């Protein structure tokens, strides 16, 4: 009964240890350079064929022979599966691991699971991949991962580094989210990504979460999620700007969604613009974030706004800005609406001195509540202006046209001369 509950831990079989006290020979140096173990066992011969002779097809049966002989079974099975994957024999590698992993030690089971996950992904067996990922996450939840330890030593690109249980959990949750998205199960994929991000922030997972939200039609949430993406860390485990590929995917999806919504908007330009703004409200957030340190932007000084709600980047902050007075401009002369007739044909009428008097009297009549003194003064000015008279020729007509249309031609000089004459006449009357 007890034998069924507790299984004794198996240790990894190995080749006979070489005797101590023997100096390193030239052959041993060769094996150290090529990372080939020393000896003449079946596993050593298989590794020599794989790494030195560069013949992976002939190395596969030699690994089989080493496993059957019980020589370094853990390493032989892992190496054989990797070589099979490189030779596009992933299905055979999966069956080999499933049938032979019972011969391996407990310490090798986790590494075999990781190789299986890669093989499942290569073969497109998403259901098997999702099931294995959930099983590994269950082991982490129960505290059975890493053989009960908090960290393990991993190897990537020839370098060793320590991996904690939390880091392994975020990696597995990210892979689970990706596999679920391939199955169009976006609800569970969103949950997996959010659980991973609750453990530790990650740019790549944040971008994939945004894509997952877009797949569900939650555009606003996706945009808000992508706004929180920070620049990549230089010495991160994935290298510089590891999330740029996910950013490109997000941008492509937004373009597709934008085209679809623009198509649904019909020919109405206003509706298309509204849909476009709803999707691409801030185009800057879809640009790849540079790999730089987090810096706090200085608050712009008052008055540096260029009118669009954003500060002017070209203004030197150390120099006091010159406040532009909007009233300090070369304004054109002011003309009352009583003087200007909207119909251009009516502007061509020939004006006499009596008409000029009527126009001037019309100006004075617009102001209500004038005192008797100001009224008498105005009538006196109108009388003397009538005596001076307005020019009864085409100059005055051209001046009025130029004032209405605002054209800057030679007529301006005539207009100025005409109005100078009027002003001079009025000044003399005062």
UniProtKB/Swiss-Prot annotation:
Any one Gene Ontology BP term: cell division
SMART domains associated with the record: TPR
Sequence ranges of the TPR repeats: 40-73, 74-107, 110-143, 170-203, 205-236, 238-257
One Pfam family from the record: TPR_19
Cellular component GO terms, alphabetical: nucleus
Coiled-coil spans in chain: 81-107
Region (Disordered): 1-21, 346-376
Alphabetized UniProt keyword annotations: Cell cycle, Cell division, Coiled coil, Nucleus, Repeat, TPR repeat
SUPFAM superfamilies: TPR-like
Location relative to the cell: Nucleus
InterPro entries in UniProt: MS5/SDI1, TPR-like_helical_dom_sf, TPR_rpt
Disulfide bonds: none
Family according to the record: Belongs to the MS5 protein family.
PANTHER family: PROTEIN POLLENLESS 3-LIKE 2
Role of this protein: Probably involved in the regulation of cell division.
Name of the protein described by the UniProt record: Protein POLLENLESS 3-LIKE 2
Organism: Arabidopsis thaliana (Mouse-ear cress)
